[in-house]
Regions:
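Active-site cofactor/cluster-binding pocket
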Residues: 1-182
Length: 182
């Protein structure tokens, strides 16, 4: 099993945090091999950002793949820039609060979640990435959900009041992902 994932969006949407959390939690809690490769645009907050995460049973030959099983897009420019890198049969995860453009491919699975609006609705606007991570894990089963929940607890160990809200946000996304899994 090997999953090639790209997460792309604006700086400030938690793109890197989402990828790093997935990679670190998977590395710590499983026997899987993982790579995380960040790529920043010219500006941090508000500029473009993307990262690659590869999860595999076998040794990973390259940390970046331009032939993706999974693509998470948190904004419209990322959809247009990277949609052609998604393999037929791949999974496209869309932040449908912001990305409203139609997807002109019928050979992929599209999983939509209004994660920006959801994060605002729960009073935690910075949790959109954790919600989307839940959507991803719920739809793909790339790693067991408990792996990410442990990763959230580890990430926020110095700010324990943030653990429960982020685990709850992750679980909200998890349910959406499970409901839309193909």
């Amino acid at each position: 099993m090997e999953r090639n994932l790209m997460i792309a969006g604006f700086g400030g949407q938690g793109v890197m945090t989402m990828g790093k959390l997935l990679a670190e939690a998977t590395s710590e809690a499983t026997d899987l091999n993982v790579t995380f490769f960040p790529s920043y645009g010219a500006a941090m907050r508000g500029g473009t950002a993307n990262c690659y995460v590869v999860i595999s049973d076998d040794p990973i030959g390259a940390p970046v793949s331009y032939s993706l099983e999974d693509l998470v897009v948190m904004n419209g420019p990322s959809l247009h820039k990277f949609i052609d890198n998604l393999k037929p049969g791949g999974n496209l995860f869309v932040n449908s609060t912001i990305v409203t453009d139609p997807v002109d491919r019928d050979d992929i699975n599209i999983i939509e979640a209004p994660v920006t609006q959801m994060s605002i609705d729960i009073g935690n606007p910075r949790a959109l990435n954790v919600i989307m991570l839940g959507v991803y894990v719920g739809a793909t089963n790339a790693v067991p959900p408990e792996v990410i929940e442990k990763g959230i607890a580890h990430k926020f160990a110095k700010k324990p009041k943030l653990i429960d809200p982020n685990v709850e946000a992750f679980r909200m996304g998890l349910e959406i992902g499970k409901a839309q899994a193909k």
